[in-house]
């Protein structure tokens, strides 16, 4: 399957659908898409990885690099739809502890809503 990324928006959250294989060949394109979102002020991101078939070390590095960029901009990156192979890679590398995972997009979107509605402490 060819690599592709598409972006949708729901309120102040960008939903990024990633399909195919995320390897060294595709990681630059993925990075540019996330950086464009950040440059345009979209700092809350949900990665829908339902269609991601494979992830190599370059793809893992790109996920981490993009996550760090989002956090530095004051945003959050969450994931949904981990295929078993991708989930196993994230567990083996301990990255499942870094990326908040949700069972579906609705749950991930609700988690952003909960953050927006949380009381501000003085």
Annotate each language-model stretch with its function.
Residues 10-11, 50, 106:
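Conserved catalytic submotifs in the C-terminal HATPase_c
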Residues 4-5, 44, 113-114:
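Short leucine-rich amphipathic alpha-helices used at interfaces
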Residues 3, 14, 45, 75-78, ...:
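Conserved beta-strand core positions
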Residues 1-17:
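Short beta-strand/loop segment at the start of cytosolic alpha/beta domains
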């Amino acid at each position: 399957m060819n690599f592709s990324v598409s972006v949708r928006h729901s309120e102040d959250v960008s939903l990024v659908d990633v399909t195919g294989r995320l390897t060294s060949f595709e990681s630059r394109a993925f990075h540019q898409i996330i950086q464009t979102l950040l440059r345009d002020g979209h700092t809350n991101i949900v990665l829908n990885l339902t269609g991601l078939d494979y992830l190599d070390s370059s793809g893992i590095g790109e996920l981490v690099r993009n996550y760090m960029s989002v956090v530095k901009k004051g945003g959050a990156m969450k994931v949904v739809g981990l295929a078993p192979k991708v989930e196993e890679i994230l567990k083996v590398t301990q990255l499942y502890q870094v990326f908040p995972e949700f069972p579906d997009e609705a749950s991930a979107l609700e988690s952003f809503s909960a953050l927006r509605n949380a009381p501000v402490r003085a």
